[in-house]
Amino acid sequence: MRTISIILPFFKYKHYFKECLQNLAQSTFKDFELIVVIDHPTEDIDDLLEEYNSIFDMRIYTLPEGVTGVAACRNVGIQQAKGAYLYFLDSDDYVLEDTLQNMIKAMDHDVDMVNGVLNHTWNNKANYLHKVENKEVDEEDQEEREQRRLNKLSDFVSFASYEKDEQQAQAIFYTMDNRRGIRTFTVLGNLYNRDFVVRNNFKFNENFRYYSDMTFMCPLLEKLNTFLRVEDAVYVKRKHNDPINEPALSQEENDNRFNERCDAVEYTRTLLKEEGVVRFCLDRKIVSYFVSKMSKRIRRSQDDLWRTDYFERIAKTIDGIRPEVMNRYKRNSKKMVACLQNRDLKGVQSCVRRKLGIKKFFRVFKNKNVLFKLAYYHIYSKKPIQDNVILFETFMAKNYSDSPKYIYEYIAKNYPGKYKCVWALNDGHEVPYGAEVVKRFSFKYAYYLAVSKYFVFNVRQPLWYRKREGQVFVETWHGTPLKRLVFDQEEVTSASPKYKQQFYRQRQEWDYLVSANPFSTKTFRSCFMYEGKMLEYGYPRNDILYWPNKDEIAKDLRKKLGIPEDKKTILYAPTWRDDEHYGKGEYKFTLALDLKLMMEKLSDEYVVLLRTHHYIADNIDTTGLEGFVYNLSKYDDISEIYLISDICITDYSSVFFDFANLKRPVLFYTYDIEKYKNQLRGFYIDMNTEVPGPLLYTSEEVVDAILNIDQINEEYKERYEEFYKRFCCYDDGNASKHIAEEVFK
């Protein structure tokens, strides 16, 4: 007989299931049987089951027709289990290598349940561990964290009047009371004595799709006598970073979810002692849900259900709470619940107003930057839209550049006086042709977000922006995609784990999206899930590369920057790395290219123009490289820099798609390509066979390629021509004109 029976339901998302099995195979504890219960999947997983059947002691069961849900799967698993202990594992989650080993050691004390640590993540195991090692996950000092928990536990024991059995109190605290909300109340992360479960006939109620865990856990906690907590047994609960296309069960949008929550609470109450601590904690959870979550919907939601049917439904559920549950709530919350029990909708709304008003006051008190958002929502958005106002923004107002710049200048020159143009720019930038300049996230910025008719942005709009009827949003984007974007990314390792969810809402506000080539059109449809109008005219920012006076512009710029006339120029333009960041929109960057070596070998003939991505927050130290390296990272317009560049070196930046319009040599310094391709983003094209230049992995190879650039040009001549036809086919110097004529009619 195996020691542990791991019960693993599978419904959908084969790629998560595969990772779950891969991680389980790495467990240091091997004495377990794996019971896989399949719930009518739409994907073929036979190959996975066959592969891992040879690795695990695996038994496979399928739910019969008419039976579905994780509760049913787990019940089958309990019935079929032969191990001494039970462990529930969801197919999109994973455990760390020593988790099971550390839990089974605790079972030497012959306890009913061992409770481990339940952590949440948006990432796969490799990226989760990377973030833990780099302290990007909330890993507080264990002693301090445990002391705080013990203080809360002591408070809980006293509050619940349950001093008579501290082990049971600890179990209730760690698995129920210390977890926020009802959704986080779960059977996961615990090891159960199977004899204890079977003897007491604990089961999951199969009528509940979302909240069956409480129907198993609450009766179990009430009967539990012995318990141990193990800090180094980690279960990792994985949130899906694409809740639009691949929602986890906890992320599903379902009209019945609210009613099921109430039904599950009311059903579970019937299994519990009326005066027991578990019932007390369950009641407190439903009250907290109403006070902190649902009450705001009653006030704010446009759906009247929250003020009619749902209001009556939650009132019925809360009618059943014990009066002492309310003892520790604040006065306003007590009043809110009393109004609910009296079916006083206006009274509840008044309490919510007061609560939100106080919260808003303290938000403003702590951060005065909140004020302009309040002005946007409550004042500016009620003003009429001004039909002649256009708001422009590039790279979160960091500079005056990119496609919005060229569209603006075309409008300013060809429609003088017709439009009032406003630029969002920080750091005191000046704009030609008389545009008004406003600072991003200022009162004036909020004002123009509310009243402008047109928007021309090359990045996403602020999350707090709400497009009004009659407004027109032109999204130019900022490059032909090499790296996989948004919904084409399997793993999101950037600063915001809700990236896909946020992007989905933001892209719904776009009326036009600019495309530089047929490849971009197809890719943007997929990665942005965009169904709106495409402006397939090339990138306005590339217009300058076709202007008849481009050589004169280049000559003037070289002179302005002080670049010696007798030196050729090498543009080095690296991009950012998703997993190396300080915060939202601020990324770390360590220069891997040996500029000192380049100076030693190339300075007689070349100088280097360094231009990092606008997301990179680090300043690159070029001390000792004066006269050879010109750091142009703060120079606004990279399109102008292209004109003075004889060679371009990049990695995975989209600059080479634009630079190729000049048909000048491109080299790719791809020292970390395997990590970038396999662990971070992945690519849309094969860099080994499709890019118009060689992949180089060391600084020495880069230097050698530059010294032999004529040979490189000849070697990549045919591929470069194919690349040009494929990716530069729309650019002809007139993109700004075509877009202006179509949008600003």
Question: How should each PLM-predicted stretch be described?
Answer:
Residues Q22-D31:
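Short, acidic, metal-binding catalytic loop of nucleotide-sugar glycosyltransferases
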Residues P64-A81:
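Glycine-rich, basic loop-to-helix element that forms the pyrophosphate-binding segment
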Residues L86:
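Short aromatic/hydrophobic "clamp" motif used to bind/position activated sugar donors
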Residues Y94-E231, Y235-N256:
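Donor-binding/catalytic cores of nucleotide-activated saccharide
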Residues R299-K383, L391, E409, K413:
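Membrane-interface aromatic/basic loop that binds lipid-linked glycans or pyrophosphate carriers
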Residues K373, L482-Y582, R719:
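A nucleotide-sugar donor-handling region in carbohydrate enzymes
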Residues N399-K413, C527, P540-T622, L696:
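Conserved catalytic-core segment of nucleotide-activated headgroup transferases in glycan assembly
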Residues S654-F727:
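Catalytic binding pocket for nucleotide-activated donors in carbohydrate/polymer assembly enzymes
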